[in-house]
A protein has these predicted regions:
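Conserved core of the sugar-phosphate nucleotidyltransferase
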Residues: 129-213
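Active-site flanking residues adjacent to catalytic metal/cofactor-binding acidic residues
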Residues: 121-124, 158
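Conserved beta-strand scaffold positions in the cores of enzyme catalytic domains, especially
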Residues: 25, 77-79, 153-155
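Conserved N-terminal catalytic core of the sugar/cofactor nucleotidyltransferase
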Residues: 1-16, 30-120, 127-134, 141, ...
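Conserved catalytic-core motifs of eukaryotic protein kinase domains, centered on the activation segment
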Residues: 21-22
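Generic secondary-structure boundary signal with a strong preference for alpha-helix termini
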Residues: 26-28, 32, 114, 136, ...
Length: 213
């Protein structure tokens, strides 16, 4: 049996909560394209033939009409729901919790739909064509497990200065790698911004300390 083709998993369950509504279906250019259109276009060019959207069930109709119906003309599309209550045995939802769980829980929602190599992206981020080309090349050239039984993973990283904006601060996961470019750690910085020609972050809105790199 040949190796299964990579699938693109798109996390979209938190779209409405992060932006106060489904703003990601609003056009970003004069041709009516939305952000996810660019990612799907680049993914298909790289070789991906199937996309799985992780969504909230209550957003399904709006999502299908605004995104899925158009994209399904170019690539196979499937949907899964990120259900707050869909937890492994022994876990329960804390009282008052309404916000979706994180990335791990979102990807867990794909069990039964994704059974081969896959890449995961956010629906509302722009990655660039190189990211999908690198991911697809890796997923089609590497075995899922090595001889010692360990799974293989990869991540596309970006130079921090290329991900900043002139319009305030951003949150980013800062990656630490070893000399062979293997990931060692990720530290979330929630307030990173440009300060002149430098990049700075603070953990307390600048009240006590500031580090630059």
């Amino acid at each position: 049996m040949g190796k299964k083709k990579p699938v693109l998993v798109v996390m979209a369950a938190g779209m409405g909560s992060r932006y106060g509504g489904m703003k990601q279906i609003d056009p970003v250019d004069e041709y009516g394209h939305i952000i996810i259109d660019f990612s799907i276009y680049d993914a298909v060019r790289a070789g991906f033939e199937k996309v799985v959207f992780i969504i909230k069930k209550e957003n399904e109709e709006l999502f299908r009409e605004g995104i899925g119906a158009r994209i399904s003309k170019k690539v196979e599309v499937a949907y899964v729901y990120q259900d707050l209550n869909a937890l492994p045995d022994g876990f329960s939802v804390p009282d008052g919790r309404v916000k979706p769980w994180g990335t791990g829980h979102a990807v867990l929602s794909c069990r039964g739909v994704v059974d081969g190599p896959f890449a995961v992206i956010n629906a509302d981020d722009y990655y660039g064509s190189h990211a999908f080309a690198m991911a697809y090349q890796y997923l089609t050239s590497e075995d899922e497990q090595s001889e010692d039984g360990k799974y293989h993973y990869m991540m596309v990283g970006y130079q921090i200065e290329n991900t900043l904006t002139e319009n305030g601060y951003v949150s980013r996961g800062i990656c630490e790698t070893d000399t062979d470019d293997y990931l060692q750690d990720i530290n979330e910085r929630t307030h990173i911004e440009k300060r002149g020609e430098e990049t700075a972050y603070t953990e307390d809105d600048g009240k006590r300390s500031e580090e630059r790199r």
